[in-house]
Design a protein with these regions (language model features):
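Loop/turn-rich, solvent-exposed surfaces of beta-rich toroidal or solenoidal domains
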Residues: 89-116
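Short loop/turn segments that connect beta-strands within beta-propeller blades
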Residues: 18-22, 64-68, 118-122, 169-172
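Loop/turn residues immediately N-terminal
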Residues: 11-14, 57-60, 111-114, 161-164
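Conserved beta-propeller blade signature
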Residues: 4-7, 50-53, 104-107, 154-157
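Blade-level signature of beta-propeller repeat domains, shared across WD40, Kelch, NHL, RCC1
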Residues: 139-173
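Surface-exposed loop and turn segments in beta-propeller and other repeat-based domains
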Residues: 26-35, 72-90, 128-137
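Beta-rich catalytic cores
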Residues: 37-40, 94, 140
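Hydrophobic core register within WD40 beta-propeller blades
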Residues: 42-44, 98, 144-146
């Protein structure tokens, strides 16, 4: 994106390289990816240059185009009522995938499902749990993509091993 290459390591170092010579332009510390084998996905907003980094259980970090790092842009929620009641308060969603839409940030947040965030504040606008239907065993939200089709925004979420769900973004009152 923006003629640059972006990488993140498990310790939370985001490196920005010149795409032509692979010279390091900038390095940012956003906090560790937990657990270490978790997906560490980034998205870069082309127009603003803002960088959003998934850190598993540690949520999402935002690096603003001015270099300011918010390592706690979005905090993954802790499950309060899981099926296995002994896990209440101990199991968290994991920020696995991220996509940038025209107005919102979309986070594939593991077993917690899809989370829609305000671009500026990181506050949750809405949430669709992964197991939205009774007897639904779809796994966790792993990857998310967004696409604009004829002026309408669609969000695609890949869950576990058995489905992709498509949402049309609408505004409600």
């Amino acid at each position: 994106a923006n003629s640059k290459l972006y990488t993140v390591d498990v310790d939370g170092n985001v490196n920005v390289y010149n795409n032509n010579e692979l010279e390091t332009l900038d390095t940012y510390k956003v906090g560790a990816v937990v657990p270490k084998d978790n997906k560490a996905v980034m998205a870069v907003e082309e127009t603003s240059g803002d960088i959003y980094v998934c850190k598993g259980e540690n949520g999402v970090a935002k690096i603003s185009s001015n270099g300011q790092v918010n390592d706690n842009f979005f905090t993954c929620p802790t499950f309060t009522k899981p099926e296995k009641t002994e896990l209440a308060g101990k199991v968290k969603g994991r920020a696995n995938g991220i996509a940038i839409g025209s107005e919102y940030i979309y986070v594939a947040c593991g077993g917690y499902g899809l989370v829609v965030l305000d671009k500026e504040t990181g506050k949750t606008v809405c949430h669709r749990k992964a197991n939205a239907y009774k007897n639904d065993d779809c796994g966790s939200a792993n990857y998310v993509a967004v696409e604009n089709v004829n002026g309408e925004e669609y969000v695609y979420v890949a869950y576990g091993q058995n489905r992709v769900q498509v949402f049309k973004v609408t505004k409600t009152k």
